[in-house]
Amino acid sequence: MISYYFQGLALGAAMILPLGPQNAFVMNQGIRRQYHLMIALLCALSDLVLISAGIFGGSALLMQSPWLLALVTWGGVAFLLWYGFGALKTAMSSNLELASAEVMKQGRWKIIATMLAVTWLNPHVYLDTFVVLGSLGGQLAMEPKRWFALGTISASFLWFFGLALLAAWLAPRLRTAKAQRIINILVGVVMWLIAFQLAREGVAHMHALFN
């Protein structure tokens, strides 16, 4: 059964490594050393819920509800555009240190709310956990399925805590105005690229619904 665990671990790692809103947010909180371990834990726990739901039957709900899929997609597009705009606005600020200081003033609950939005309003999360993991894990018998799910969940915990701790460790180098500007530009551009990609998928979903 351990082979199913490592299959899940490898697949989970491959899906979580690319830069996305979740990873960008965890990285930024790590650089600021601001609730970064709490955010890593909440991201991992969110993945635990989503992965479990996808592998143990939740994928059917999303696949059988095209309107729900379209709603999730366009909600994600709106959020990613807003998130990317915020990152680019900070990067282009004439006083980057002042803009960064304003971000640092954010309270714990606002940071948690942003993390929840970054995770739960990201359509790629549902496609990865419900569609990809759901289709693969759903074909397994119950015992292998549990080991497969445990592997993918382990990948999330290892990655988010590793990313948060690494970013915090590199914070002295990454907190400079130049590094922050580059990071924010990179995050903003990536968020907008993902948003435009999702918008194309959203148009395809809407076209399928009305034809």
UniProtKB/Swiss-Prot annotation:
Entry's Gene Ontology molecular function annotations: L-arginine transmembrane transporter activity
GO CC annotation terms, alphabetical: plasma membrane
UniProt keyword Ribonucleoprotein present: no
Keywords from the UniProt entry: Amino-acid transport, Cell inner membrane, Cell membrane, Membrane, Transmembrane, Transmembrane helix, Transport
Catalytic activity from the UniProt record: L-arginine(in) = L-arginine(out)
Matching HAMAP family: ArgO (MF_01901)
Protein role: Involved in the export of arginine. Important to control the intracellular level of arginine and the correct balance between arginine and lysine.
PANTHER family attached to this UniProt entry: ARGININE EXPORTER PROTEIN ARGO, ARGININE EXPORTER PROTEIN ARGO-RELATED
UniProt-recorded name of the protein: Arginine exporter protein ArgO
Species whose genome carries this gene: Salmonella schwarzengrund (strain CVM19633)
